[in-house]
From Swiss-Prot:
Keyword vocabulary terms for this entry: Ribonucleoprotein, Ribosomal protein, RNA-binding, rRNA-binding
Presence of keyword Ribosomal protein: yes
Record's protein name: Large ribosomal subunit protein uL3
One Pfam family it belongs to: Ribosomal_L3
GO biological process terms held by the UniProt record: translation
Gene: rpl3
Described function: One of the primary rRNA binding proteins, it binds directly near the 3'-end of the 23S rRNA, where it nucleates assembly of the 50S subunit.
Transmembrane segment boundaries: none
Complexes and interactors: Part of the 50S ribosomal subunit. Forms a cluster with proteins L14 and L24e.
InterPro entries tied to this protein: L3_arc_euk, Ribosomal_L3_dom_3_arc_sf, Ribosomal_uL3, Ribosomal_uL3_arc, Ribosomal_uL3_CS, Transl_B-barrel_sf
A GO molecular-function annotation: structural constituent of ribosome
NCBIfam families according to UniProt: L3_arch (TIGR03626), PRK04231.1 (NF003261)
GO CC annotations, alphabetized: cytosolic large ribosomal subunit
Recorded family membership: Belongs to the universal ribosomal protein uL3 family.
């Protein structure tokens, strides 16, 4: 019988409580020195299928051969740039300087309270006057869930996305050029690239320590104490309190998680190429642009997911994969 093993459950994610909102938030962005561009996008998870593609991984046993790869389908209709927000830095850290809002934001009436007057010209002058102190240029973009048949919501999801590349003036000018317009994901990422996928996981509610942390069920005499699914010990005699590392019952799921370096297998516009017979379970048919991501991603169907340029990419050669077949078989069993 094995007497020594790693502790049950990871200590990397604490406190294990529910996320504050359904829209994931990024605290960091990758470095980029090229032409100004957006570093993120968002879509809605439709479901999973599989593709048959040519294995282009160097020195792989199946290099050059057909392999079956599971993929996640994300529906990505165009997003609209609602505002520009610039940050300056002082002794207390970064804080917003001002914002430039676009006109005709009736679509956001259910999400924010619109100001009676739009002082975009005054805000633009203020930013240009302090452009030497600007450290970050962000844009506020919102999704269009009304264009999706699989997502039963009307209110857009509003989020902040970083503009990277070039000087602060170049980034601000680029943000002004796309203010109030629709942006497509194809202008940001391409097939074969790697991206970070962030979402809010499935909520499991209040769960015990066995399911939440994977602790071992108590056996023999200990199981007959009617505490078969309890932790074996709450800790030592001293210190005289239960430490936070002890597996305890509590909230499980509905937490923000990021998966790094997920490969983009395909970006397309014709949804008939990937819609399975009968549609995706708990979602339906994809009717807009879509992206296929290798592997699984956090969250259930219909859940908003954010896509960011890879932060831990390293130096890897980018090449578009050769997809020979996309499964259209029914997912209903």
């Amino acid at each position: 019988m094995r007497t020594v093993r790693p502790r049950a459950g990871s200590l990397a994610y604490y406190p294990r409580k529910r996320a504050k909102g359904i829209v994931p938030k990024y605290q960091s962005w990758p470095e980029y020195n090229g032409q100004p561009m957006l570093q993120g996008f968002a879509g809605y998870k439709a479901g999973m299928t599989h593709v048959i593609m040519i294995d282009d991984h160097k020195k792989s046993p199946t290099e050059g051969k057909e392999v079956m790869v599971p993929v996640t389908v994300i529906e990505i209709p165009a997003m609209t740039v609602a505002a520009i927000r610039v940050y300056v830095k002082d002794t207390y850290g970064k804080h917003p300087l001002t914002e430039v809002w676009a006109e005709n934001l009736e679509a956001l009436s259910g999400r924010i309270t619109k100001a009676k007057t739009n002082n975009a010209a005054k805000a633009t002058e203020k930013i240009n006057a302090a452009i030497g102190d600007v450290v970050e240029v962000m844009v506020l973009m919102y999704t269009k869930p009304t264009e999706l048949t699989g997502v039963p919501k009307k209110v857009p999801d509003l989020m902040e996305i970083r503009v990277a590349g070039g000087s602060a003036q170049e980034r601000f000018d680029y943000a002004l050029s796309i203010l109030g317009t629709d942006v497509d994901m194809k202008s940001l990422l391409s097939e074969g690239q790697f991206a970070d996928i962030t979402g809010i996981t499935k909520g499991k509610g209040f769960q015990g320590a066995v399911k939440r942390f994977g602790i071992t069920l108590r056996k023999r005499k200990h199981a007959r104490t009617k505490k078969e699914r309890h932790i074996g010990t709450l800790g030592p005699w001293t210190p005289h309190h239960v430490r936070w590392q002890v597996p305890m019952p509590g909230q499980m799921g509905f937490q923000q998680r990021t998966e790094f370096n997920k490969r983009i297998i395909k970006i397309g516009e014709n949804a008939d190429e990937i819609n399975p017979a009968g549609g995706f379970l708990h979602y339906g048919l994809v009717r807009n642009n879509y992206v296929l991501i290798k592997g699984s991603i956090p969250g259930p169907a219909k859940r908003l997911v954010r896509i960011r340029s890879a932060t831990r990419m390293g130096e890897q050669k980018i090449q578009a994969p050769v997809v020979e077949y996309v499964s259209l078989q029914s997912k209903q069993g």
